[in-house]
Amino acid sequence: MESSLDRLNFDEFVAKLLIHESKKKNKSFVDHGYIEKEKTKLRPNKVFLNNMVRNVQSHNRGINNRRRDQKRKQLISIKQDNDLNVSSERLSRRIDVPRPTSKKKRLYKETPDLDEPGSREKRVSQKGQLKIEKV
């Protein structure tokens, strides 16, 4: 993971390149007979500056993309670790999510218990609903 120190070093490197480029340009102007006063007003080449800005931006985007990818991979590995049951090495159901109950079990639990022993019951199904009637 890139630290802020690495970024400072890269920015310092860019600044040194800019200074070097401006010195080169200033030297060429002095060689061609420009006076010292005009030399101080000179700036580095705009194309060079734009290229350097683009390089810095792409470098920073690369750092951010790598950080995002690392975080995503870390979250995926944590999630996989949580989903794996160590004893069976198979995917296990999460503890906080209850198992789905089937309709039959749910309907059976909702039916009233018949207190009388040996009583008969008649099950009638109407449109998917189960009703129990005493006979």
From Swiss-Prot:
> Which species is this UniProt entry from?
Schizosaccharomyces pombe (strain 972 / ATCC 24843) (Fission yeast)
Q: Biased composition, Polar residues: where in the chain? A: 77-89
Q: What is this protein called?
A: Uncharacterized protein C13G7.09c
Q: Which residues lie in Basic residues bias regions?
A: 64-74
Q: What is the lineage of its organism?
A: Eukaryota, Fungi, Dikarya, Ascomycota, Taphrinomycotina
According to the record, the residues making up region (Disordered) are 56-135
Regions of compositional bias (Basic and acidic residues) in chain numbering: 108-135
A Gene Ontology cellular-component term: nucleus
